[in-house]
């Protein structure tokens, strides 16, 4: 016990920003799921020093930078305890897709994934995969999702850590199943999951 007290008093643990490195790990793994080959060390250099890794594409670098900015925004928002809205989710998606999003012109109209616009076309899970919700049903589904999540946040027992984690996982699952955007759904819904965890004091 004396050794532990002396260790804490020394301030050694304050020399490392564990929260920053945890956040960089979340970002690196989330973009890796989407095909990024940038490592945690490379992201640290990119985020902190502006040094890009040799052999990594501009798209990969921008994907990681955008997600970092979205995480900073989302974690700050989580402290304000505001209700989830469609506009907030669109803002998250816009930040995630800021430099890698694209404008689309389809039968349903024009939309821009870099602006967080909800998709106006139908999408499937890969070529020949299962189709997601029809695009015409997406706006109501996202609004209903926000209503559900707000109700859950209000009533959950924050001392029940397992229940809080389950809620964050279910929020991710429900939103990614709706697949509101044409691209960036995985990154945005994982970010939402982490925002819920932040809001509930888990991370």
Regions found by a protein language model. Give the residues of each.
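FIC/Doc superfamily catalytic core
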Residues: 1-203
